[in-house]
Amino acid sequence: MVSQTTSEVQPTMGVKIFSAGVAACLADIITFPLDTAKVRLQIQGEGQTSSTIRYKGVLGTITTLAKTEGLPKLYSGLPAGIQRQISFASLRIGLYDTVQEYFSSGKETPPTLVNRISAGLMTGGVAVFIGQPTEVVKVRLQAQSHLHGIKPRYTGTYNAYRIIATTESLSTLWKGTTPNLLRNVIINCTELVTYDLMKGALVNNQILADDVPCHLLSALVAGFCTTFLASPADVVKTRFINSLPGQYPSVPSCAMTMFTKEGPTAFFKGFVPSFLRLASWNVIMFVCFEQLKKELMKSRQTVDCTT
């Protein structure tokens, strides 16, 4: 993200934020069924016996959902997901370079690992607080099932916002902020820092040019590292956000209940769809993000030259 040649015009902060938001929305649209499968696998086993477990594996979950609830169910919560990327990814990714440059200001040497981690912590934390209501609605819509005559809690995205705010409280829209903050701090730092370091190593050692293959490989490596480290916090976040009022007194209580009833492997439920989703999301997002920045700056240069 920062390893551009000196001959290139550096993208402005506005270009970075816009490019990150557009790229993240496109990645979300393409990978959303994997995210829905991940959520269903993560909440599976919660208050259920083994005989009621219906989902087995990524493809099995997607197939079961499509057959029993219809193909549109795979995209339930997508509007909230798009809203989340606009308010969340555009900030955590789009502001990363700018904040990193701020921490490195006055220094001629490349950004240190501490500078990169600090930038990831700051942009991730701010983005989580702003985008948390969209995360709550997205998870609730993805988790609700229409089977066995169960009346869905919500009929749509804006209906979910209204019902949550009026029947539970406005603060419920920020439910699960703590585990989501932990998850996204891990994700933001691991994802952006790993991508940044991997891309820098490939380009600086002349293994690959700063182009699509380099961006693709860097995104895949970042996706695996991020999924592995963030999985426990991701599962706890999903369980806590989807829980009924009073089901879990606190986030630690949710984690302890999972551990005692389901064992340590519960914290890695949905790992495969989570990795497939995050890896593919990373590839689409980072490749589109890099290309959008370049094309927008080229367009800007062309306009400047003609005026």
Curated annotation (Swiss-Prot):
Superkingdom classification of source: Eukaryota
Regions of this protein lying in the Mitochondrial matrix compartment: 33-73, 134-178, 233-266
Cysteine sulfenic acid (-SOH) found at: C254
Activity control mechanisms: Has no constitutive proton transporter activity and has to be activated by long-chain fatty acids/LCFAs. Inhibited by purine nucleotides. Both purine nucleotides and LCFAs bind the cytosolic side of the transporter and directly compete to activate or inhibit it. Activated by noradrenaline and reactive oxygen species. Despite lacking canonical translational encoding for selenocysteine, a small pool of the protein has been observed to selectively incorporate selenocysteine at 'Cys-254'.
Solcar repeat extents: 11-102, 111-201, 210-295
All ranges on the Mitochondrial intermembrane side of the membrane: 1-10, 97-116, 196-212, 290-307
GO biological process entries: adaptive thermogenesis; cellular response to fatty acid; cellular response to hormone stimulus; cellular response to reactive oxygen species; mitochondrial transmembrane transport; proton transmembrane transport; regulation of reactive oxygen species biosynthetic process; response to nutrient levels
Gene Ontology cellular component list: mitochondrial inner membrane
UniProt keyword Membrane, yes or no: yes
GO molecular function (one): cardiolipin binding
Function (record text): Mitochondrial protein responsible for thermogenic respiration, a specialized capacity of brown adipose tissue and beige fat that participates in non-shivering adaptive thermogenesis to temperature and diet variations and more generally to the regulation of energy balance. Functions as a long-chain fatty acid/LCFA and proton symporter, simultaneously transporting one LCFA and one proton through the inner mitochondrial membrane. However, LCFAs remaining associated with the transporter via their hydrophobic tails, it results in an apparent transport of protons activated by LCFAs.
The family this protein is said to belong to: Belongs to the mitochondrial carrier (TC 2.A.29) family.
Protein name as it appears in the record: Mitochondrial brown fat uncoupling protein 1
Organism of origin: Phodopus sungorus
